[in-house]
Amino acid sequence: NLYQLKNMIKCTNTRHWVSFTNYGCYCGYGGSGTPVDELDKCCQVHDKCYDTAKHVCKCSPSMTMYSYDCSEGKLTCKDNNTKCKDFVCNCDRTAALCFAKAPYNNKNFKIDPTKGCQ
């Protein structure tokens, strides 16, 4: 879920999680157009993963609680999750790891989606 995604970001990243809430065309609520960079692409992939969870697993990914471990920047989804919980956990895990390795461009924070996301 979104709260756990925030905590996963905190586990893998030195940058504050708020930096990812309104970045590019896909990081934050909604998303459209072409991702502006690699980090924005991470968010687009995460959005698509959540869409798949909704349609294939029939669950609400933004509200689904799952079990995971964070140790020294490493994230592990626990084995005791249901199929849906495991799917959502892996969506969030993949996004957090992607955020950690993608370059952050300050000019893409809080861009105007009506101008930059066509």
UniProtKB/Swiss-Prot annotation:
Family matches, as Pfam families: Phospholip_A2_1 (PF00068)
Gene3D superfamilies in UniProt: Phospholipase A2 domain
Main location: secreted
Similarity comment: family membership: Belongs to the phospholipase A2 family. Group I subfamily. D49 sub-subfamily.
Residues that coordinate or bind Ca(2+): 26, 28, 30, 47
Annotated GO MF terms: calcium ion binding; calcium-dependent phospholipase A2 activity; phospholipid binding; signaling receptor binding; toxin activity
One GO term of the biological process aspect: phospholipid metabolic process
Cofactor notes: Binds 1 Ca(2+) ion.
UniProt xrefs under CDD domains: PLA2c (cd00125)
Protein name in UniProt: Basic phospholipase A2 nigroxin A
Organs and tissues of expression: Expressed by the venom gland.
Taxonomy, superkingdom: Eukaryota
This enzyme's EC code(s): 3.1.1.4
InterPro entries in the record: PLipase_A2 (IPR001211), PLipase_A2_Asp_AS (IPR033112), PLipase_A2_dom (IPR016090), PLipase_A2_dom_sf (IPR036444), PLipase_A2_His_AS (IPR033113)
Active site: 46, 92
Cofactors (names): Ca(2+)
Key word Metal-binding present: yes
